[in-house]
UniProtKB/Swiss-Prot annotation:
Highest taxon listed in the record's lineage: Bacteria
Species per Swiss-Prot/TrEMBL record: Desulfovibrio desulfuricans (strain ATCC 27774 / DSM 6949 / MB)
The UniProt record lists the keyword Cytoplasm: yes
Record's keyword terms, sorted: Cytoplasm, Methyltransferase, rRNA processing, S-adenosyl-L-methionine, Transferase
Protein EC: 2.1.1.199
One GO location term (cellular component): cytoplasm
Any single GO BP term: rRNA base methylation
Known function: Specifically methylates the N4 position of cytidine in position 1402 (C1402) of 16S rRNA.
Record-given protein name: Ribosomal RNA small subunit methyltransferase H
Record: residues binding S-adenosyl-L-methionine: G42, G43, H44, D61, L95, D109, Q116
């Protein structure tokens, strides 16, 4: 694990989504300790650290470029900002390294940053033309999008695009990819985007409100970075690190991720978990959290006008009210 605090890199403009709503959900307390599992360029982290005196924050990101930019942005907070280069599912390792046994609040903002989307060489976007990469951590040994596109089977590609991208044309797109790579490898985002666009039926292209490659690129990015697995592993652990009164806020941009967060929070808020045929509760299980909003919080008109990428963002948050009774 690499602890990083850079003060040499110039920051790139990036607007954090739902900034006011996220801070309200976390309700930071003076002297509290907070975890930002998806640090990005430090927008939410800066707001948390500025919100009350004496706050400390542990910020994680597997994108070294973003981590360096965040380090520069947060340098004015000195030793109150602790930054680590790691996956957010490995947050316990970072907290243990700091000697923390609890955090008063935790935040995830699960999306691709403007930094990643706007730099063609990162391979996340179908606008521009860059290498097929899509790895959040470009120095990792994990297979890139190039491997997925040029080496995986038709069935695996189809399943990936259909499941993670929720793409109705997954079969046509996977077939087009497999047929094309038999002639030449598909090396760039531009090549892949054009291939996907041609695979779409003309009638679908004519009425499409977004680029035909949107869902395919999303699916490949999620597969390359194991994004659902990351989220599942985080949710399985985080509640044990919150004290009574501690809060968790999660911002998602994709229906599969939002569904996973919603299901986890519903599970935590359950009371009795006895089988239905038992007439009286014998498990004694009590709700572990209270859900802070009846519906997910979404961006208002002003934010959408300033940042169109906030349109699909959904914020869900809980407050811990009891320890797990062990049932």
């Amino acid at each position: 694990m690499i602890q990083t605090m850079s003060d040499t890199t110039e920051p790139t403009r990036h607007v954090s989504v739902l900034p006011v709503e996220t801070l309200a959900a976390l309700d930071p307390r003076a002297g509290g300790r907070y975890l930002d599992g998806t640090l990005g360029m430090g927008g939410h982290a800066s707001a948390i650290l500025s919100s009350a005196p004496g706050i400390e924050l542990c910020g994680l990101d597997r994108d070294e470029e973003a981590l360096a930019l965040a380090g520069q942005r947060l340098s004015s907070f000195g030793g109150r900002a602790h930054l680590f280069h790691c996956r957010y599912s490995d947050f316990a390792e970072a907290l243990n390294e700091l000697g923390w046994d609890k955090v008063d609040g935790a935040l995830l903002d699960i999306g691709v940053s403007s930094l990643q989307l706007d730099e063609a060489e990162r391979g996340f976007s179908f606008y521009g033309d860059g290498p097929l990469d899509m790895r959040m951590d470009q120095n990792s040994a994990q297979p890139s999008a190039w491997h997925w596109v040029n080496r995986e089977s038709f069935d695996k590609l189809k399943d990936c695009i259909a499941t993670l991208g929720e793409e109705p044309q997954a079969g046509r797109i996977a077939r087009a990819i497999v047929d094309a790579r038999q002639k030449n490898t598909i090396d760039t985002t531009g090549q892949l985007a054009a291939l996907v666009e041609r695979a779409y039926p003309a009638a679908w292209r004519a009425k499409a409100r977004r680029h035909p490659a949107t869902r395919t690129f999303q699916a490949l990015r999620m597969a390359v970075n194991d994004e659902l697995g990351e989220l599942r592993r985080f949710l399985d652990q985080i509640l044990t690190w919150l004290p009574i009164g501690g809060r968790l806020a999660v911002i998602t941009f994709h229906s599969l991720e939002d569904r996973m967060v919603k299901q986890a929070m519903r599970h935590w808020v359950e009371g009795c978990r006895c089988p239905r045929h038992i007439p009286r509760c014998i498990c004694g299980h009590q709700p572990e959290v209270r859900i802070l909003h009846k519906k997910p919080v979404q961006a208002g008109p002003e934010e959408l006008a300033a940042n169109s990428r906030a349109g699909s963002a959904k914020l869900r948050a809980v407050e811990k009210i009891a320890e797990d009774s062990g049932s």
